[in-house]
């Protein structure tokens, strides 16, 4: 599958390394008065991203990051999750709905992975053949890779 289009944003200089993955949590209070906030805050809150490139340019001062920020190219990361096996087909589009699960379940983190948003559309890029532990609700689960 082709690499998705990238977005240019600013990130703390210490974190500006290709391959670094992060979840954008939204603006800090200090960002409100910054003249660069439109570039920094152009990502979707609680979505997972990977840095795929660095832009040429200088470090810029930042009230949040002590060593300043750099311009980087980011793409939305694929998400590893589990879903009902009867719905897991390579290439299909789906709208993610978080299942109602017990937090003590062994699969809870895979059923509710970080960086995924309820109501967002994802494409199932791969259905893995490996076994997933038993579901407390009695569902048959498959591990999948989802892309926005």
Curated annotation (Swiss-Prot):
Domain of life, source organism: Archaea
Disulfide partners: none
Pfam families found in the cross-reference section: UPF0179 (PF03684)
Alphabetized HAMAP family for the sequence: UPF0179
Family: Belongs to the UPF0179 family.
Name of the protein in its database record: UPF0179 protein UNCMA_27840
Record organism: Methanocella arvoryzae (strain DSM 22066 / NBRC 105507 / MRE50)
């Amino acid at each position: 599958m082709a690499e998705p289009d990238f977005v240019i944003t600013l990130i703390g200089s210490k974190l500006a390394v290709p391959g670094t993955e992060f979840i954008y949590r939204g603006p800090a209070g200090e960002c409100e008065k910054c003249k660069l906030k439109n570039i920094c805050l152009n990502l979707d809150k609680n979505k997972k991203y990977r840095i795929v490139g660095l832009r040429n340019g200088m470090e810029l001062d930042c009230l949040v990051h002590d060593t300043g920020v750099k311009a980087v190219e980011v793409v939305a990361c694929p998400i590893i999750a589990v879903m009902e096996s009867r719905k897991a087909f390579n290439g299909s589009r789906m709208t993610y709905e978080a299942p109602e699960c017990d937090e003590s379940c062994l699969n809870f983190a895979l059923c509710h992975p970080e960086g995924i948003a309820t109501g967002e559309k994802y494409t199932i890029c791969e259905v893995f053949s490996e076994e997933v532990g038993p579901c407390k609700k009695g569902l048959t689960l498959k591990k999948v890779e989802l892309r926005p």
